[in-house]
Amino acid sequence: MKMMSTRALALGAAAVLAFAAATAQAQRCGEQGSNMECPNNLCCSQYGYCGMGGDYCGKGCQNGACWTSKRCGSQAGGATCTNNQCCSQYGYCGFGAEYCGAGCQGGPCRADIKCGSQAGGKLCPNNLCCSQWGFCGLGSEFCGGGCQSGACSTDKPCGKDAGGRVCTNNYCCSKWGSCGIGPGYCGAGCQSGGCDGVFAEAITANSTLLQE
C-alpha cells in the first residue's frame, strides 16, 4: 500500500511538472495573447510567444527585453513603456540609470544594481542585461557591446563549436550554438541549460538571481 502511495505521488508530481513545462512553452503574449506581457522581461516575439534570444527579442519583438528600445514619453505622443520599464528623458524605454535616473518620464525610477565581473560575477534579476561597466539595465547602453549576461542584443555562442561554453542565466544552448529561452533553444538538440523543453526553471531563476 505504501509503495502504491509513493508511486502515485511520484506520478502526480511528474504530471504537474509536465503541465508547468507545457504551459511555459505555450505562453502567449502581445497582440496574439490579449496584449499580455511576458514574465521577468522575457521577450514577446512577433508571433506572440514568450522567450529569449534572437527569435524572440529581434525583429518584430512586441514587448520585454527587445533588442530595439521602444519610444515613449513626450517624444512619442505620451506613449508609456511595457513591462514596467522606465521612460528616459530622451524618450526611450529601458532600465538603469540612463533610463530611470535624472529626467525619467515614467516607470520605476531607481538606483543602479551592480553585476558581472565588477560585482563578483553576480547576475541581474529578471533577465536584465549586465553592461560592460557592471550595472543592470535594459536598452542599448546595457544590452549592446560588452554586455556580460542577461538579454544581450547579440546571441552569445555556446556549446561544442564554442569550446564547450555554457550560457549565463541558465539559458539554453540551442543545437545551433546560441543562447536563449524557448522551444527553439531548449527543445530538440539543446546542448546545455534548461533543456528538454523544461525551461520554466530558467525563467524562475532569473527572478531571484540578485535582489536589491
Curated annotation (Swiss-Prot):
The modification Pyrrolidone carboxylic acid is found at Q27. Residues 27-68, 69-111, 112-154, 155-197 form the Chitin-binding type-1 domain. One of its GO terms (molecular function) is chitin binding. The keyword Signal applies. It holds the Pfam family Chitin_bind_1. The keyword Transcription does not apply. Substrate binds at residues 36-38, 88-99, 140-141. Keywords: Chitin-binding, Disulfide bond, Lectin, Pyrrolidone carboxylic acid, Repeat, Signal. Disulfide bonds join C29-C44, C38-C50, C43-C57, C61-C66, C72-C87, C81-C93, C86-C100, C104-C109, C115-C130, C124-C136, C129-C143, C147-C152, C158-C173, C167-C179, C172-C186, C190-C195. Residues 1-26 form the signal peptide. Residues 198-212 form a propeptide. The 4 sites proposed for binding to carbohydrates (N-acetyl-D-glucosamine) of receptor molecules are on the surface of the agglutinin molecule. Homodimer, u-shaped. N-acetyl-D-glucosamine / N-acetyl-D-neuraminic acid binding lectin. This is Agglutinin isolectin 1. It comes from Triticum aestivum (Wheat).
